[in-house]
């Protein structure tokens, strides 16, 4: 059985497996709680036991299971039904279930492979002039040139990002006026790097590479583990910077109408 709930607590979420999906769910909960319509939580229950939690933040679905719990084929069938009703733009879940779910909803979704990376520190923080508290409009100006989904959602992006930054759940970095990177969450001692971009006229000059390495060393010095995800064509790039592959998963993305 899968049912929506507003009784999620931090204690409940602490019982989930320690992975990216759990940290994503926690970051949403810690940012907004359970009182907003744009953030919904569901419990997966089998044989009277809670086996997992689902969050749907705007149009992104995140799924994680409790420690020592697994999802049966019947639970995945029911999950596919929930997906068909909600039709999220993106679905992320543990690697052991991603392709199984895709086999059930593949008519509406594409399945893309990702590699998860962890930063390997050399304990050498470069001397760089990085703005750790940039104006978010300056960050947006750069991101908008690389991410159409952000470009077309300025108010939503600004509201959510500033909300999370104020609560210490996210942070943006700016190198000069040309390269930026954002920490998408800082949860349970892990920082997830995402949304790295450089303005077109400065690309190819290794700005993003230098900023990512600096962020890795800076956050490691503060005691955080630094992670990021990359699609197959970017794997060697992150390995060269100093990131080590630690896992693979599959992300489901809803097909656009003309596919």
What kind of feature is each model-predicted range?
Residues 71-82, 198, 204-221, 230, ...:
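Conserved acetyl-CoA-binding loop-helix of GNAT-fold acetyltransferases
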